[in-house]
Amino acid sequence: MYAREREMYPPVMAWFRRVLKGRFPTAAVETYDTSTVGLNRFLQGQGLHHLFPQYQSYDIFVDVTAVVRLRKSGLLGFVECKRNQISLRDLSQLLGYSRVALPAYSIIVSPAGVTQAVHYLLNTFGRLDVLEYSSGRRLKVATWDPWREEISLPTLIPPGEYR
């Protein structure tokens, strides 16, 4: 499958860009590998910082970042990629990033699915509240299909939130 997490980034970036372009057809949508640079420095270096007034506080290292440029503002989208099963620690990492920057979309994906603890927490015990990072916004968790190069919709948590 993937020998390294980094190998997931190009197909994930292409998929995420397609999804966001479908949702914002008139906006400029780009996806970036931001895994090795702080998001604050990245936005400033790309000249996108003016779209995000709080960008200086974004000292976070998200694997894939999408920028949706609207007329005078912008939206962020995050995807964290995991080669192994998604753990509670992984969820916590993305939850922290999302609470800092408040992206419009925040997704964590892995071709290996989720750990048993995550499955129990979210599916068996229905604790979807732990995914919330802002009012009306919560993380999405999904299995990445490496052959189709997109998420597997039946695995999406919370179910039905593919919007």
Set out the residue ranges of the language-model regions.
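Well-ordered alpha-helical segments embedded in enzymatic catalytic cores
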Residues: D63, D90-Q93
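Conserved catalytic cores of phosphodiester-cleaving nucleases, focusing on short active-site segments
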Residues: V12, V64-A66, L75-R83, Y97
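Short, charged/polar micro-motifs that form catalytic or ligand-binding hotspots
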Residues: Y2, E80-S87
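Alpha-helix termini
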Residues: V19-P25, V68-K72, G126-Y133
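Active-site metal-binding core of divalent-cation-utilizing nuclease and nuclease-like domains
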Residues: T26-L75, I86, E149-E161
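Nucleic-acid nuclease catalytic cores
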Residues: Q85-D90, R99-R137, V141-P146
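Intrinsically disordered, low-complexity terminal regions enriched in charged/polar residues
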Residues: A3, P10-A14, G126-R163
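Nuclease catalytic cores
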Residues: M1-A28
